[in-house]
């Protein structure tokens, strides 16, 4: 297989814990680009909250909001949006089941909205500018809703009430993401392949969390980080070093010629 695209999750994968990309990794990515390999990002973050890294990487492909939005070389090629009415229903059900004080974030194509008690940028400086709202008069189409739910029974009930959505819990906390059923990273990859004229066998995908399992299984090479959850490691073709110790950079250094057939 000749690899034509390297596709990276951000948090826990391409990004170190301090939310930076190592110099070693950036150097190896540039070498790959010089050999004609495209670089892509596939993240659960909104595009808005990924801009710091998008600007640094200048990727050919950006899959954001957990697969609900796909951009190829600057042009949107796929959107899986909830209507305004559907978005209001999502918010209402979250309030009914989890309480009106539950923390919610919503991605739209242009913005990231939140009702946190604390500005998220105070906790993570890499987080892009967000728009604060109490969501009572929210009137936008949306790509993704995330809800922080500490009670497992409430989480299960909300998932049951939103059975028409794709729901994934993030492993590092109590946040659950809800998107359209069609909005997954793997489905986004299929749309991207049609536009790019490549096959999934020509993609190497890197990830660490539940939302990455499907894309690692789909792509020709699935690579799990050393810090990945066990479920991701179980489906990967390779398990490499962790995100804080140049896992990706070292993998590209040592395996590129052999596995990518360059």
Identify what each model region corresponds to.
Residues 97-206, 210-218, 227:
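Conserved acidic, metal-coordinating active-site core of Asp-based
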């Amino acid at each position: 297989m000749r690899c034509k695209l390297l596709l990276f999750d951000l948090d826990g994968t391409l990004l170190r814990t301090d939310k930076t990309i190592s110099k070693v990794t950036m150097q190896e990515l540039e070498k790959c680009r010089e050999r004609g390999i495209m670089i892509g990002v596939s993240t659960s973050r909104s595009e808005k909250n990924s801009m710091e890294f998008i600007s640094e990487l200048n990727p050919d492909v950006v899959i954001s909001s957990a697969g609900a939005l796909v951009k190829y070389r600057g042009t949107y090629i796929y959107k899986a949006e909830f209507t305004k009415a559907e978005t209001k229903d999502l918010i209402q059900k979250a309030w009914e089941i989890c309480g009106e004080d539950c923390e919610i974030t919503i991605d739209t194509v242009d913005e990231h909205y939140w009702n946190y008690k604390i500005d998220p940028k105070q906790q993570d400086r890499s987080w892009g500018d967000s728009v604060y709202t109490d969501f009572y008069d929210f009137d936008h189409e949306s790509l993704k809703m995330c809800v922080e739910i500490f009670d497992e029974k409430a989480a299960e009930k909300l998932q049951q009430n939103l059975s028409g959505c794709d729901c994934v819990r993030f492993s590092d906390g109590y946040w659950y993401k809800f998107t359209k059923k069609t909005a997954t990273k793997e489905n986004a990859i299929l749309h991207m392949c049609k536009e790019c004229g490549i096959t999934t066998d020509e993609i190497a995908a890197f990830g660490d969390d539940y939302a990455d399992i499907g894309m690692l299984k789909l792509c020709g090479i699935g690579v799990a980080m050393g810090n990945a959850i066990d479920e991701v490691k179980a489906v990967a073709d390779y398990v490499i070093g962790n995100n804080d110790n140049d896992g990706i950079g070292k993998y590209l250094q040592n395996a590129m010629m052999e596995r990518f057939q360059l």
